[in-house]
UniProtKB/Swiss-Prot annotation:
Keywords: Amidation, Pyrrolidone carboxylic acid, Secreted. Belongs to the tachykinin family. Expressed by the venom gland. This is Tachykinin-like peptide-VI. The lineage of its organism: Eukaryota, Metazoa, Ecdysozoa, Arthropoda, Chelicerata. The keyword Ribonucleoprotein does not apply. Signal peptide: none annotated. It comes from Phoneutria nigriventer (Brazilian armed spider). The modification Methionine amide is found at residue 10. It is found in: Secreted.
Length: 10
């Protein structure tokens, strides 16, 4: 899920 948040920043 943390990776998903990182993708959201993109």
């Amino acid at each position: 899920q943390k990776k998903d948040r990182f993708l959201g920043l993109m």
